[in-house]
A protein has these predicted regions:
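Short, charge-dense linear interaction motifs
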Residues: 1-92, 96-243
Length: 243
């Protein structure tokens, strides 16, 4: 009799467990009745703003003579750039930086015995910002012609920017959202359901890389300034209910 009673209790427990698990599975399925998709918006564009900088200097033991030489070099640079079609008001010169240079002295047996003053070095930079990308790009390559005038000019690589970035970002968000919705509709269609209302939307990181470059995306966002031709991309993560 006791064994029979135990069997009944065990059977009831199994049935109860089955009902509970079945309900839990149904509730989980309802909770999971949604589609999560990621859409991509991407486009290529060309920079419309160039920033180019260069540095020149003068060295002499006499500070005044160093400054006179620097001013002479500056005048030669200014004339050269204006002759290349750059307006003088576009030339932004930095303040003059002054450094004292010393030579380390050693004894015949290699021991350090002190320093000798060798002169002053005065350094100045010039910067140009322009929407005429072709012109400034050409000047940055030809600036070494100043060497023929005895002017040592150290040219940096140009940096490229896009002034309509805010509008471009809006376009990319729109493209990414459309792409994500299309993916969600296809998933719902293939699963026999119908796409419901949008539950959530989350924007990814805006990335700008050089076209056909080996640059990789970063968590904080990539912002390329080395390439004139660029690619922009952004992702949108959407969650839809499924009906």
């Amino acid at each position: 009799m006791k064994q029979y009673t135990n069997a009944i209790i065990f059977g009831i427990a199994i049935v109860a467990s089955s009902i509970f698990l079945g309900k839990a599975y149904t509730d989980r399925s309802k909770a999971d009745g949604e589609i999560r998709v990621t859409g991509l918006g991407k486009t290529d564009f060309s920079s419309d703003l160039i920033v180019w900088e260069g540095e020149f200097s003068a060295q002499n033991k006499d500070l005044k003579q160093s400054y006179l030489t620097l001013e002479k070099n500056k005048a030669a640079i200014n004339k050269y750039l204006v002759n290349k079609g750059i307006k003088s008001q576009q030339l932004i010169y930095s303040a003059v930086k002054t450094d004292e240079n010393f030579k380390r002295l050693y004894s015949s047996d290699g021991k350090f015995i002190g320093e000798e003053f060798v002169g002053y070095e005065l350094t100045q930079t010039v910067k140009i910002e322009s929407n005429d990308v072709d012109k400034i790009e050409k000047v940055s390559r030809e600036i070494t012609e100043l060497l023929n005038q005895g002017v040592q000019f150290y040219s940096e690589s140009p940096r490229y920017y896009y002034t309509k970035l805010a509008n471009l970002k809006i376009q990319m968000i729109s493209k990414a959202t459309q792409d994500a919705r299309l993916r969600a509709e296809k998933i719902a269609e293939f699963s026999g359901g119908r796409l419901g209302k949008l539950e959530s939307a989350r924007m990814g990181i805006f990335q700008i890389t050089g076209q056909n470059s080996k640059e990789t995306y970063s968590w904080g966002g990539t912002f390329n300034t080395d390439s004139r031709e660029k690619s922009a991309s952004i992702t949108m993560k959407l969650t839809y209910k499924v009906e």
